């Protein structure tokens, strides 16, 4: 299916103990199998450097344009060719470990559209083309709920990550 490139994308929790060592080990032992690394749960500044070292794409998971800008300015701008996508996990719709600023109320969900538009605007300011997708993750259950995001020039290329709903909650 993937031809001469890998067909596997792995997900690593950045704040997990030993994440960098584990990531190096996985990528060293799976050369040619892994094509991308999705990484969140923290600010994975070194993700781009590690991914580029092994010739795989990096897909950071972020919850705001501000977080992406910090990652881009500090590290990601050095290897933009390996940025595969930006995964946006909404602080209110996705699983609960996403960052909110002190000005945001966790009990008052906000519409994700303005936040994703702000992310795209930031990406454009940094010279990242609209063809590089933003992946909307968390709270995506039905495509019909997101139809106005598809082929929307304000947002550029958009993809959707579907997950499973929690079976047991309090």
Predicted feature residues:
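Glycine-rich phosphate-binding active-site loops on the catalytic face of alpha/beta enzymes
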Residues: 42-43, 90-92, 97-99, 142-170
């Amino acid at each position: 299916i993937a031809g001469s490139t890998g067909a596997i994308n792995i997900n690593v929790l950045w704040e997990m103990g030993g994440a960098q060592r584990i990531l190096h080990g996985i990528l060293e032992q799976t050369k040619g199998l892994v094509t991308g690394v999705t990484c969140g749960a923290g600010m994975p500044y070194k993700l781009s450097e590690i991914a580029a070292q092994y010739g795989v794409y990096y897909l950071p998971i972020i919850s705001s344009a501000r977080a992406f800008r910090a990652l881009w300015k500090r590290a990601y701008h050095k290897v933009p060719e390996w940025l595969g996508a930006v995964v946006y996990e909404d602080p209110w719709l996705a699983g609960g470990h996403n960052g909110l600023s002190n000005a945001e109320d966790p009990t008052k969900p906000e519409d994700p559209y303005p936040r994703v538009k702000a992310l795209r605007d930031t990406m454009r300011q940094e010279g990242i083309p609209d063809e590089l997708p933003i992946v909307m993750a968390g709270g995506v259950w039905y495509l019909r709920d997101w139809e106005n995001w598809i082929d929307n020039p304000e947002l550029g290329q958009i993809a959707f990550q579907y997950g499973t709903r929690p079976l047991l909650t309090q």
